[in-house]
Amino acid sequence: MKRKNLFWYQLSVLCLTSALLVTACTPAPKELTPIALQLQWVVQSQFAGYFAAVDQGFYNDEGLEVTIKEGAVDIVPQQVLASGQADFAVSWVPKALVSREEGAAIVNIAQVFQRSGTLEVSWKDSNITRPEDWKGKTVGTWGWGNEFELLAAIRKAGLDPDADLTILQQPFDMSLLLNREVDAAQAMTYNEYAQVLEAENPDTGQLYQPEDLTVINFNDVGTAMLQDAVWAREDW
């Protein structure tokens, strides 16, 4: 065999041997366990961490193939979980505790939110600066278990929620407040509060500013409750 051909033959054998060694040393792909995570609401910044973990491969690193199921008005995540239609669910603690009282065998395995994100937002000229000022006013809430902090604040202020003010179920936006159809509206720090600040003030043509608003934060009032947690069935 000519020297030149011998060189290329030896190089080919070396490359093939190296490839076989690399293949032999490479671990077999990890078998992933499929699981489903039910969100409490539609996709929004509230759930950014779960999607970031999918995008960055964190779940796969732990041997999990996670399917994230979007929530909706008619979806109760803890009930979806209890019925076996999801392996895990994200739900506010008070709502899940109500479901437990009703027989749902679910447990909190990860308390994600350490502070409440719920606000009650009013216009500055409404002169609402504390829960006591809701007396005689129309106050919005979404209901569906989202009203527990509000009701606790009303009672802590010495008001009767059935007699001293009007509690109105608001849509999942800030239209009632923007149209001044309520004196105060429920909002989350990571969603609806920003919606107001992204709306245009028709009197100025500029976006509303924080100084145009009064915000009652339930963490300050003392009636805040734990919110987003990851729940699993007791037999998990």
Across the structure, where does each feature detected by a protein language model lie?
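A short, ordered amphipathic alpha-helix with a cationic face
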Residues: 24, 139, 221-223
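Pocket-lining segment of extracytoplasmic ligand-binding domains
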Residues: 94-95, 172-176, 180-236
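Short, glycine-/small- and polar/acidic-enriched structural segments
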Residues: 30-170, 176-179, 183-190, 215-218
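Compositionally biased, intrinsically disordered low-complexity regions enriched in proline and serine
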Residues: 8-11, 51, 60, 209
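Short, low-complexity disordered leader/linker segments with a strong preference
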Residues: 1-34
